Amino acid sequence: ERKSNGPFTSLFDFASRLDLRKVNRKAFESLIRAGAFDQIHSNRASLLASVNLAITKAEQGHAHQGQNTLFEEFETSEIPLIDSDIWEERKQLAEEKIALGFYFSNHPFKFYEKMIREFVPNRLSELKPRESPYLIAGIISVIRMRMTSRGKIAIITLDDGAGRIDVVVGNKILTEVYDLIKEDKLLVVEGRVSHDDFTGGNRISAIKVYDLLTIQSSKAAFLSIS
């Protein structure tokens, strides 16, 4: 469609030129969250709020196409978007992850990196198996809960923008820090790195798990670990 009739000029133009039987509301929302319309309009929140209106107007236009009515001169590009506050960058990144499964325009770890690197110099991409524990930090990107003979454990994937690693949190520790383990949240982990025969990469077995508040209030104590 774009090659045949030129670039899309607005969300409403996009909706009016597509077969809405093939492109549904969820597809519109995913494209917006991923930034596909950024060159047309930079406010993704307004675009997302206007999806229903765009689809409704497009359906009306399709229904009256060719009839001698006002819809024959259907000017989709002139319909205003619904006003909505622009997303803060953290919100935008979270929405990208909903659509794509990963952060695209930036990485949320950057909001903490300067402070975290003062006492957690270890980047996830640089970790190697060793006996002494590491202190690591990253954003929780994936959480998997497993039942074992020793109770429930969590396998969480931490991501610092440069690398990723799976962290195994045993039942005892998990019980203590369960409320801290949430997707898209920063976590600091003290643990031992070992080779994971199943994935071929490394994984870390958690000894202790900390949230940002604990780290900020006890920086000096963590310098000796890192």
What are these regions (language model features)?
Residues 224-226:
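Short, surface-exposed ligand-recognition loops at beta-strand->loop->(often short) alpha-helix junctions
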Residues 1-129, 192-194, 199, 203-213, ...:
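Sliding clamp-binding short linear motifs
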Residues 147-172:
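OB-fold (S1/OB) nucleic-acid-binding surfaces
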Residues 173-189:
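Short nucleic-acid-contacting surface segments enriched for D/E, G, S/T with interspersed K/R
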Residues 133-148:
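Structural detector for short beta-strands of small beta-barrel domains
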Residues 134-136, 154, 187:
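Hydrophobic core residues within well-ordered beta-strands of beta-rich domains
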